[in-house]
From Swiss-Prot:
Protein name: Siroheme synthase
One Gene Ontology biological process: methylation
Residues annotated to bind NAD(+): E22, I23, C43, E44
Catalytic activity: uroporphyrinogen III + 2 S-adenosyl-L-methionine = precorrin-2 + 2 S-adenosyl-L-homocysteine + H(+); precorrin-2 + NAD(+) = sirohydrochlorin + NADH + 2 H(+); siroheme + 2 H(+) = sirohydrochlorin + Fe(2+)
Disulphide-bridged cysteine pairs: none
InterPro entries to which the protein is assigned, alphabetical: 4pyrrol_Mease (IPR000878), 4pyrrol_Methylase_sf (IPR035996), 4pyrrole_Mease_sub1 (IPR014777), 4pyrrole_Mease_sub2 (IPR014776), CobA/CysG_C (IPR006366), NAD(P)-bd_dom_sf (IPR036291), Siro_Cobalamin_biosynth (IPR050161), Sirohaem_synt_dimer_dom_sf (IPR037115)
Gene: cysG
Amino acid sequence: MDYFPIFCQLQHKACLLVGGGEIAERKARLLLDAGALVTVNACEFTPQFHHWADQGQLSLISGEFVPELLADKWLVIAATDQLSVNALVYQSANQQRIFCNVVDDPKRTSFIMPSIIDRSPIMIAVSSGGKAPVLARLLREKLEALLPQHLGQLAGNLRQRVKQHFTVMTERRRFWEKLLTHDRLAQSLANNDHVQADQHVEQLFSAPLTDRGEVVLVGAGPGDAGLLTLKGLQQIQQADVVVYDRLVSDEVMNLVRRDAERIFVGKQSGHHCVPQEQINQILLQQAQSGKRVVRLKGGDPFIFGRGGEELEELAGYGIPFSVVPGITAASGCSAYSGIPLTHRDHAQSVRLVTGHAKKEGQLDWANLAAEKQTLVFYMGLSQAGEIQQQLIQHGMPATTQVALVENGTSRHQRVVSGELSQLALLSQQVSSPSLIIVGSVVSLREKLNWFSSRHHDDQPKVTECVAHVG
């Protein structure tokens, strides 16, 4: 984080603006809107500055900038076209520990002025730190279109009434969520139809807020937070409680609503930190207490995630539930490794297989060893030797290509590859969570490996290893 986002209360605070042109004029409008006591210093001023001065809205000081003008000022903005003047303003402000913004000069700036969406009392600031101004502008435009003009004012007017009407914090939050996502209310505000808007508000106050809890099963995807679905993001930002496991990345957890309770039930193959039965009970108890619970699972909750078992338990007690699918590890890891799971010349089908089946004969190895298909083993590291032995024993060529993807789709992704006869050895080079991909499609990785070929200064390089038969 290059800049600490902060909102300043500038009402009746003395601020200095150096510059009298059109750019300075835009900065002056912002300071005046914030209620600041504005002094403008320049050799020449636009007519608008003279108009403001005549109206008593700001003060003008004609002449060259001198450091003494900074006395008793809270902040200063330099908006001249003279680099030497801007540099002097910045240097003088720095010496006096006064925040200074030099327009279009990030190196001589101790604070930045973001794009602003004003829905007072709701204020939204968007900034790229000067590195992507077009992106910041596009985001502002989208937010401007998304938020009705009078929404913030309506929320401010209702605040005290909501506080009195709903004594429980969770009830207040749910009321606000309903109000702020009410499409017809938003349309009424956009149309300036305040009578209709008031009717929608009254309906929300009179509608019962159920105390009945619910559970939403959300797939967090394989690691990269950008692969979390929009609906998944909405759910984790509305949750009272988030129950999550170790396969959910820190980047995804950073998107969870800050005041939501977080319950870690991490587990891994062969070692259950929290027994499945206890996880079921946690979900049940939290929902029965009237909370909105998100069960957040890595990948997709219905693919080797035991999501079905958890929902069966909830269904038995009549707890409402829903499911938000996620990108499963097989899809994410293969895509980020440049390995297509199907290909007309290599594989006409793909099989997702659990790698820690413990009962002898549980897997149909003869079928798995068939040609023209791709195998993806989940949780298979500890059984890599068994997988290698069984597939070769049932007819799969020992030279079949394999790849192991560790921490797939994350910046720490590692891929090791080789032949089936080396699988047990390769498994010792990676750690969990890892995915095993078996099939001739792995040979396409060298051609299609887009992710590790990208070099980012702020990201560790993705590691690629290839084992060769001696």
